[in-house]
Amino acid sequence: GLFLDTLKGAAKDVAGKLEGLKCKITGCKLP
């Protein structure tokens, strides 16, 4: 349903932010 899709989108967004934060800390280069 819509709620689940929203939840998935939010989870993906958070995962992306965490990944970016990790890259800032470790200095890895995003493609």
Curated annotation (Swiss-Prot):
Q: Would I find NADP among this entry's keywords?
A: no
Could you tell me the Gene Ontology terms of the biological process aspect for this record? defense response to bacterium
Q: Any S-S bridges, and between which cysteines? A: C23-C28
Keyword Transmembrane attributed: no
Q: In which tissues is it expressed?
A: Expressed by the skin glands.
Give the matching InterPro entries: Antimicrobial_frog_2
Q: Where in the cell is it found?
A: Secreted
**What GO cellular-component annotations does this UniProt entry give?**
extracellular region
Family to which this protein belongs? Belongs to the frog skin active peptide (FSAP) family. Ranatuerin subfamily.
The protein depicted here goes by the name Ranatuerin-2
